[in-house]
Amino acid sequence: MSPSDSCIVMNPSQGLAQPVPHARPKAGRFVETPTVKWLRQAFAVLHATSPAAAAHLAYVLLTRPPRVPERPWQASLRERAAQDALPFGRGQLALYGWGSGPTVLLVHGWGARGTHLGKMVPPLVAAGYRVVAFDAPGHGHSSGRSATLPQFASAIAAVAAHVGEIHTLVAHSFGVAMALWAQLDWGLRARRQVLFSSLDHCKWVTEEFARLMQLPEAVLARGRQLMVERSQGAMDWERLA
């Protein structure tokens, strides 16, 4: 599986519009680094001595988003926002708002932050929209160091319920899958949607991780199963297709 190479503009009342082609995104986080080489060796040792421990490590890494440094322009945009902290689970979500008018909700991808789509904020505000962004669980300034898929999806719905009617939902990459799941299972509603650089299937992320770490299929399968078991029934890989 791979990321999609198109953008879909969606109006729930009118169905899907035609995909808008754009450059195919690169899986930039699935690259060779010294840390990756070390982890690959660790997985090899664990698989030989304790496959269960190898699967647990896979689960931990698959639910721990990478910490990407905040860029200066993102920090500046965040500092100019009306900021809020929304209670969520055992922690809180960091919320950011700019402007006034119909609400546009921005949903970032895995390992990003609320201001990742911040270049959209000034033109949207100038056009008379209120723009809301947030850091997903375990991302940016929100609580936690890890995030399960159900936490990510339900957080989108929680933010939407908090800020009120969503005129347009804009989601990127992994955030697209989570936003669609939030609509299926957590009651998220938006009049319009702009979804771009999505995944064909959420399993793609785990497949790329396994390829990078050279994981045996059994370890990957058990790691995925742990994600299901620890979601207390909220996870269903086929439903996320």
At which residue positions do the language-model features occur?
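An N-terminal hydrophobic leader/cap segment in hydrolases
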Residues: 4-5, 29-85
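A short loop-to-beta-strand scaffold at the N-terminal edge of the catalytic core in hydrolase folds
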Residues: 83-98
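The alpha/beta-hydrolase serine catalytic core
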Residues: 44, 189-241
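Active-site glycine-rich loops that stabilize anionic/oxyanionic intermediates
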Residues: 101, 109-112
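Gly/Ala-rich beta-loop-alpha elbow adjacent to hydrolase catalytic centers
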Residues: 170-179
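Conserved alpha/beta-hydrolase fold motif
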Residues: 168-169, 193
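Conserved alpha/beta-hydrolase
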Residues: 114, 121-143
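Conserved acidic catalytic loop of the alpha/beta-hydrolase fold
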Residues: 151-167
